[in-house]
Amino acid sequence: YVGERIYHDSKYYILDTPQKKILVFDENGNFLYDINKHGNGPGEYTELYSFYFNPFTGDLDLLSPMGGILRYDSLGQNFKEKIPLPLTVPAVHQFIALDKDTYLLFSDSREGNKMVVYNIVQRKIISELYDLPKFLLFNTFYHHTYSPFYICEGKVHFVQSYNGDVFTFENNSLIPKYHWDFGEQNFEISDLKDEPMEYYFKYARTVGAKYANIFVSYGENSRYYITDFAYDNKYWTLIYDKQSKEPVVFNAFKEGHECIPSFVDESGVYLIGADPNYGLNILNAEDLD
């Protein structure tokens, strides 16, 4: 399936998770090349969960959950270095750079706090936070599918995928930014039990469907915040106008397509579907007015 998706330097980068490689396309959707470092040698990975263009170094960082961060040049061709992970973190599944020496790491499998702030020069965990039960991340749908981190207006943001709350990350703390009040449809995890995945397949279609949850895709620019979520066994889109401070919620465009944002910039919202008949669509910012 399609994993992480990034628009960078006039190119689309899409993680092909099963093949463990990154596909690169031009702005017209034409395939250019792939970045494939799968293997067991130096600078190679056995698993690839995420990737990131590091704004502090200009390099492409590839995240191997147990193998570390592999740093390549911006084209993904020349290997530069391997950044090992902290010994107390069994695996890292998502990441973002806070500065040239520091990363914010998210580990689904770590006991206790799932986020750690890690200084790669000192090889030291600076702080840790965000304690969630492991079963929530492995047995349920109430967790992120893509990176929970994004940058907007120079700040690192974190999306809490089970209820859509958005935070900025400042001074090693999560600062609330957006909270969506669905009233009686607000979703809480406090009553969830450690049950197998089969239990939560049924739960999501029955009890869970009564609430707004599973915020999978999201993005923000200077004018709008946009996200999609599940409710009543359908996917819905929420667009928040930061000027009017008014949200709009809808199920699909009038043409029939759902709006599941892959990423957002100042020009609009990019929608990439795994279905070959869906392809790439761009919703211009003016069309939201």
What are these regions (language model features)?
Residues 1-18:
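Beta-strand-rich domains and repeat architectures in extracellular enzymes and scaffolds
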Residues 2-4, 46-51, 89-98, 138-147, ...:
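Repeated scaffold domains used in trafficking and secretory/extracellular systems
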Residues 7-9, 53-57, 97-100, 151-153, ...:
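Residue-level detector of Asp-centered blade-edge/turn motifs that repeat once per structural unit
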Residues 21, 30-57, 64:
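Blade-loop segments of beta-propeller domains
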Residues 26-28, 73-77, 119-123, 170-173, ...:
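Short loop/turn segments that connect beta-strands within beta-propeller blades
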Residues 47-48, 64-114, 127-138:
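Asp-box/WD-like beta-propeller blade repeats and closely related beta-sheet repeat scaffolds
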Residues 116, 120-174:
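Loop-centered beta-sheet repeat module
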Residues 177-208, 243-267:
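Conserved blade-ending motifs and adjacent loop-strand segments that build the rim/top face
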